């Protein structure tokens, strides 16, 4: 499965848009 790769990309995006992610979380 490419879940691991998908997760890595997801985390990469989160790190890049940490502020956006934080706002989206709430």
UniProtKB/Swiss-Prot annotation:
Keywords: ATP-binding, DNA-binding, Nucleotide-binding, Phosphoprotein, Transcription, Transcription regulation, Two-component regulatory system. This is Uncharacterized protein in glnB 5'region. It comes from Klebsiella oxytoca. Probable member of a two-component regulatory system YfhA/YfhK. GO terms for molecular function: ATP binding; DNA binding. Phosphorylated by YfhK. GO terms for biological process: phosphorelay signal transduction system.
């Amino acid at each position: 499965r490419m879940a691991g790769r998908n997760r890595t990309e997801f985390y990469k995006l989160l790190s890049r848009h940490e502020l956006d992610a934080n706002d989206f979380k709430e």
